[in-house]
UniProtKB/Swiss-Prot annotation:
Together with the chaperonin GroEL, plays an essential role in assisting protein folding. The GroEL-GroES system forms a nano-cage that allows encapsulation of the non-native substrate proteins and provides a physical environment optimized to promote and accelerate protein folding. GroES binds to the apical surface of the GroEL ring, thereby capping the opening of the GroEL channel. It comes from the Bacteria. Belongs to the GroES chaperonin family. Keywords: Chaperone, Cytoplasm. One of its GO terms (biological process) is chaperone cofactor-dependent protein refolding. It is found in: Cytoplasm. This is Co-chaperonin GroES. SUPFAM superfamilies: GroES-like. GO terms for molecular function: ATP binding; metal ion binding; protein folding chaperone; protein-folding chaperone binding; unfolded protein binding. InterPro entries: Chaperonin_GroES, Chaperonin_GroES_sf, Chaprnonin_Cpn10_CS, GroES-like_sf. GO terms for cellular component: cytoplasm. The lineage of its organism: Bacteria, Pseudomonadati, Pseudomonadota, Gammaproteobacteria, Chromatiales. The keyword Cell membrane does not apply. It holds the Pfam family Cpn10.
Length: 96
């Protein structure tokens, strides 16, 4: 099954964070916070403006992005955990 977001929605796959602290302490899964970085796996057609025009999204498939800790809605598609969020919930695109 494939998932296709509508309008200004974006599908993001979380990127795993480091499991060890800078001091070498292993962080157990129960204490680790949800990652706030991810990779865009699908984008909608664009945001519908008040004038009726459709503005293309700034992010594209493959972009690595930063988003808020509580952004988006968790969904499970074919046993894969994904996030559905609005483009406005994305704070930055990671480059390099």
């Amino acid at each position: 099954m494939k998932i296709r977001p509508l309008h200004d929605r974006v599908i993001v796959r979380r990127m795993e964070e480091e499991k060890t602290s800078s001091g070498g302490i292993v962080i157990p899964d129960t204490a680790a916070e949800k990652p706030i970085r991810g990779e865009v796996v699908a984008v909608g057609n664009g945001k519908i403006l008040e004038s009726g025009e459709v503005r293309a999204l700034d992010v594209k498939v493959g972009d690595k992005v930063l988003f808020g800790k509580y952004s988006g809605t968790d969904v499970k598609v074919e046993s894969e955990e994904l996030l559905v969020m609005r483009e406005d919930d994305i704070m930055a695109v990671l480059e390099g």
